[in-house]
């Protein structure tokens, strides 16, 4: 899980979602998981 000021989709499988008011990227590839904060 990377915590970054701006989250971006890295590949085609990445999805940007909102969870508990946080913007997150979820993906099949665990290296692509990101959270904004």
Curated annotation (Swiss-Prot):
GO terms for biological process: translation. InterPro entries: Ribosomal_bL36, Ribosomal_bL36_sp. Signal peptide: none annotated. It comes from the Bacteria. Pfam families: Ribosomal_L36 (PF00444). Keywords: Ribonucleoprotein, Ribosomal protein. GO terms for cellular component: cytoplasm; ribonucleoprotein complex; ribosome. PROSITE patterns: RIBOSOMAL_L36. GO terms for molecular function: structural constituent of ribosome. Belongs to the bacterial ribosomal protein bL36 family. PANTHER family: 50S RIBOSOMAL PROTEIN L36, CHLOROPLASTIC, LARGE RIBOSOMAL SUBUNIT PROTEIN BL36C. NCBIfam families: rpmJ_bact (TIGR01022). This is Large ribosomal subunit protein bL36A. It comes from Kocuria rhizophila (strain ATCC 9341 / DSM 348 / NBRC 103217 / DC2201). The lineage of its organism: Bacteria, Bacillati, Actinomycetota, Actinomycetes, Micrococcales. The gene is rpmJ1.
């Amino acid at each position: 899980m990377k915590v970054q000021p701006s989250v971006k989709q890295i590949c085609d499988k990445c999805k940007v979602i909102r969870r508990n008011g946080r913007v997150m990227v979820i993906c099949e590839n665990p290296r692509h998981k990101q959270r904004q904060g």
